[in-house]
């Protein structure tokens, strides 16, 4: 059993290395998913921020959590694209004929998404610091933020895996991400939900992004998190489990 586990994780490591090499050979993926959220952050802070009432003195502090989620939602679309291209090229069939763990190729793509999105998040936070972002959070709060963002990334990445495995075209593989990118705009990411019309506010307060954004914002400000963190974790974990099981089912059907 220990030998099987060792080979399984070794196979995943090889596939992760393969996918990461593709990323670093073509850095436009990370650059694209980093530059767009940064441009959005610049626009909202320096052009629109003065007209938005959030109850905080520093709008970039309020804005950053939502920008990070948008960056992640943008980044996972490339996972769907890369998976689709692997399926189309027939490389998965070649992997299945080799003495390696069957799902290691899929896990390689998922972990690559986690690493590449983590790089984007770090770059965006560094830019936010230059723009005036400040946090009083301690190491434990930062670790909690990292954990929430990692779970959010994994949850969306497994959704991306479903799209990449099921899509009939390149456009179809990436199109699923548009609603995910749009969700932060109907949440507390940019403005408090109190300012929204009734039906919009009801939707905003009961969708996953608002609780995730509020939890991260409170952690970074060293403020009481309340139930937001548990609601955020429940959303992330629920989506992660469902998407993982569905993606593995689709993968096994494709591999059969």
Residue ranges and their predicted role:
Residues 22, 53-54, 187-242:
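Membrane-interfacial helix-loop-helix junctions in multi-pass membrane proteins
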Residues 102-177, 224-248:
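Alpha-helical transmembrane segments and their short interhelical loops
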Residues 2, 25-29, 72-77, 107-112, ...:
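Short alpha-helical transmembrane interface motifs in multi-pass membrane proteins
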Residues 249-256:
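Short cytosolic juxtamembrane segments of multi-pass membrane proteins
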Residues 1-36:
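Aromatic- and glycine-rich beta-strand/loop motifs that create alpha-glucan
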Residues 44-51, 164-206, 210:
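Transmembrane helix segments
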Residues 39-44, 60-131, 178-179, 184:
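Hydrophobic alpha-helical transmembrane segments of multi-pass membrane transport proteins
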Residues 35-59:
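Transmembrane helix-loop-helix hairpins at lipid-water interfaces of multipass membrane proteins
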């Amino acid at each position: 059993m220990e030998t099987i586990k060792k080979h399984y994780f070794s196979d995943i490591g090889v596939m992760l290395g393969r996918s990461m090499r593709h990323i670093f050979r073509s850095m436009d993926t990370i650059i694209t998913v980093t530059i767009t959220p940064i441009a959005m952050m610049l626009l909202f802070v320096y052009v629109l921020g003065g007209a938005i009432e959030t109850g905080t003195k520093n709008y970039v502090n309020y804005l950053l959590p939502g920008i990070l989620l948008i960056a992640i939602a943008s980044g996972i679309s490339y996972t769907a694209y890369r998976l689709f291209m692997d399926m189309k090229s027939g490389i998965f069939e070649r992997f299945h004929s080799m003495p390696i763990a069957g799902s290691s190729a899929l896990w390689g793509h998922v972990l690559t998404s986690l690493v590449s999105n983590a790089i984007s998040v770090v770059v965006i936070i560094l830019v936010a610091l230059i723009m005036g972002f400040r946090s009083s959070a301690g190491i434990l709060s930062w670790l909690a933020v990292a954990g929430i963002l990692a779970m959010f990334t994994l949850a969306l990445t497994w959704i991306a895996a479903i799209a990449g495995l099921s899509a009939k075209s390149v456009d179809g593989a990436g199109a699923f991400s548009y609603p995910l990118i749009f969700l932060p705009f109907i949440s507390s990411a940019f403005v408090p939900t109190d300012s929204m019309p009734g039906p919009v506010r009801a939707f905003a307060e009961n969708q996953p992004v608002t609780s995730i954004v509020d939890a991260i914002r409170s952690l970074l400000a060293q403020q009481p998190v309340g139930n937001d963190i548990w609601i955020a974790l429940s959303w992330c974990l629920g989506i992660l489990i469902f998407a993982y099981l569905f993606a593995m089912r689709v993968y096994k059907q494709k591999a059969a």
